[in-house]
């Protein structure tokens, strides 16, 4: 089982390239895809994330931004007039962007954030704007393990979609054939011993 950052590619690529890439596109992505079920699900997950932050007494700025987002979503649900709905949409997207930025800055391992980042990165990989710069020894190691019949799994805080896209769009081509499965934050925390046991049972 491999991690991604610092294991198969430089941490700096994720921090300096991928995170800013998604951050610059939060607003455009949400506005252009607002009516899609996927985005509505992601916005709902953001609200749930805020509620979880409240439960644990989080004091980071993300908690305050989440409160504003939750209020905006409530306003939209209560609106019946089209003009009010459009105003609510703009308010929600604006609040969501601030919340996503706050989560990013606070380095909160938010599944909701990771899903939205993954959707944005998906477009970037398909358009050729993103390419994963693997360490030089990674392609050979993956190929060697495949020849030996050793299964390789990935576990990262990034969404499964992001992981799949990353290995399918590397600086040396598509290496996804060497990966047997992917785990993300929906599978549990990296620091949880019980979750690690469940991974081994699954693979």
Protein language model annotation of sequence segments:
Residues 188-189:
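Multi-pass alpha-helical transmembrane bundle typical of ion/small-solute transporters
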Residues 111-117:
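Phosphate/adenylate-binding glycine loop and adjacent helical scaffold
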Residues 118-119, 128-171, 182-185:
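Substrate-recognition element of Asp-dependent hydrolases with the DxDx(T/V) motif
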């Amino acid at each position: 089982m491999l991690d991604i950052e610092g294991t198969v590619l430089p941490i700096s690529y994720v921090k300096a390239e991928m995170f800013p890439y998604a951050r610059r596109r939060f607003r455009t992505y949400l506005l252009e895809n607002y009516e899609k079920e996927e985005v509505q699900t992601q916005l709902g997950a953001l609200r749930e994330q805020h509620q979880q932050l409240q439960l644990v007494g989080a004091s980071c700025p993300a908690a305050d931004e989440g409160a504003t987002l939750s209020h905006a979503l409530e306003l939209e649900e209560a609106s019946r007039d089209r003009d009010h709905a459009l105003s609510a949409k703009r308010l929600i997207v604006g609040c969501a962007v601030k919340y996503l930025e706050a989560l990013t800055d606070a380095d909160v391992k938010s599944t909701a954030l990771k899903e939205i980042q993954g959707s944005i990165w998906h477009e970037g990989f398909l358009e050729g704007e993103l390419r994963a710069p693997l360490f030089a020894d990674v392609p050979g190691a993956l190929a060697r393990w495949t020849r030996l019949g050793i299964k390789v799994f990935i576990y990262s805080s990034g969404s499964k979609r992001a992981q799949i896209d990353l290995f399918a769009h590397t600086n040396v081509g598509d290496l996804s054939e060497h990966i047997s499965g992917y785990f993300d934050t929906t599978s549990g925390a990296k620091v949880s011993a019980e979750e690690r046991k469940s991974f081994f049972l699954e693979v």
